[in-house]
Amino acid sequence: MPELPEVEVSRMGITPHLLNQTIQSLIFRTPKLRWVIPSELKKLQGQVIRHIGRRAKYLIIETDVGSAIVHLGMSGSLRVLDADFPAGKHDHVDLKLSNGKVLRYNDPRRFGAWLYAAPGEDHDVLGNIGPEPLTNAFDGQYMFEKAQGKRVAVKQFIMDNKIVVGVGNIYASESLFRSRILPTRATMSLSAEEWQRLVSHIKQTLQTAIEQGGTTLKDFSQADGKPGYFAQELQVYGKAGEPCPECGEAIQEQKIGQRNTFYCSYCQC
């Protein structure tokens, strides 16, 4: 599943091709992805793209009459192509531009979404969510205060979008390993110093992943079709049974909150 770094990489990749371009047409080859594609998106035809933003794992393509809100789901990707490039089997949405390009949305599993938000309004999917992890609002003190009285495993806690957005499964495992914190620990058991360390590693891990173009494990590719290279930086994720890069002990795998979790039981405590 594309996580925050992959969505941010997509935003950075499409922005130079979309910004200040006019949307000539919107083509939908399916009526429904995760949700029904709203007819209001057709309002964006003929409008100039003013800004391409991101909130959590949602891309926001803004015009004067409203915004398209795009979620990549489990297997979605966005590519910028020449407008006459033929569509493939899983190419469900085309946004044709005045510069002769098309923003094409591909999603084999159809778990993604294209939604509409009126000017100045937030869609319901963006309500009641936590701060962005790469902003100053997300710091050790904030997490320490939020953690008080919480017995849930720390890995589940940092993946809760109501606490902080965009810390997905891959980056949660990697950040906890780099912080030397066991993912099964009760959230309330972490000290203020441990929270500061974990927050620092979450920020570093996400930023490095963005700089590396994200993590390509299966479906994700950048806007130009290239893979992300952060997979080469992974230290524990997907490496059960392999030697820990720090101590040589076998990396463990365990289900936490129904998600595969990878850690070193010797290095992390």
From Swiss-Prot:
**E.C. number(s) listed in UniProt:** 3.2.2.23, 4.2.99.18
Instruction: Please list the cofactors this protein needs.
Output: Zn(2+)
- Classification via SMART domains: Fapy_DNA_glyco, H2TH
Pfam families with a match to the protein in the record: Fapy_DNA_glyco (PF01149), H2TH (PF06831), zf-FPG_IleRS (PF06827)
Task: Kindly state what the record says about how the cofactor is bound.
Answer: Binds 1 zinc ion per subunit.
Which reaction is recorded as catalysed by this protein? Hydrolysis of DNA containing ring-opened 7-methylguanine residues, releasing 2,6-diamino-4-hydroxy-5-(N-methyl)formamidopyrimidine; 2'-deoxyribonucleotide-(2'-deoxyribose 5'-phosphate)-2'-deoxyribonucleotide-DNA = a 3'-end 2'-deoxyribonucleotide-(2,3-dehydro-2,3-deoxyribose 5'-phosphate)-DNA + a 5'-end 5'-phospho-2'-deoxyribonucleoside-DNA + H(+)
Which InterPro entries is this protein grouped with? Answer: DNA_glyclase/AP_lyase_DNA-bd, DNA_glyclase_Znf_dom_DNA_BS, Formamido-pyr_DNA_Glyclase, FPG_cat, MutM-like_N-ter, Ribosomal_uS13-like_H2TH, Znf_DNA_glyclase/AP_lyase, Znf_FPG/IleRS
**Which residues belong to zinc fingers classed as FPG-type?**
235-269
Which residues does DNA bind?
90, 109, 150
Q: What are the recorded GO MF terms, alphabetically? A: 8-oxo-7,8-dihydroguanine DNA N-glycosylase activity; class I DNA-(apurinic or apyrimidinic site) endonuclease activity; damaged DNA binding; zinc ion binding
Query: What does the UniProt keyword field contain?
Result: DNA damage, DNA repair, DNA-binding, Glycosidase, Hydrolase, Lyase, Metal-binding, Multifunctional enzyme, Zinc, Zinc-finger
Catalytic positions are: 2-3, 57, 259
Example GO BP: base-excision repair
Q: Which family does it belong to?
A: Belongs to the FPG family.
Job description of the protein: Involved in base excision repair of DNA damaged by oxidation or by mutagenic agents. Acts as a DNA glycosylase that recognizes and removes damaged bases. Has a preference for oxidized purines, such as 7,8-dihydro-8-oxoguanine (8-oxoG). Has AP (apurinic/apyrimidinic) lyase activity and introduces nicks in the DNA strand. Cleaves the DNA backbone by beta-delta elimination to generate a single-strand break at the site of the removed base with both 3'- and 5'-phosphates.
Assembly behavior: Monomer.
What this protein is called in its record is Formamidopyrimidine-DNA glycosylase
Q: What is the lineage of its organism?
A: Bacteria, Pseudomonadati, Pseudomonadota, Gammaproteobacteria, Vibrionales
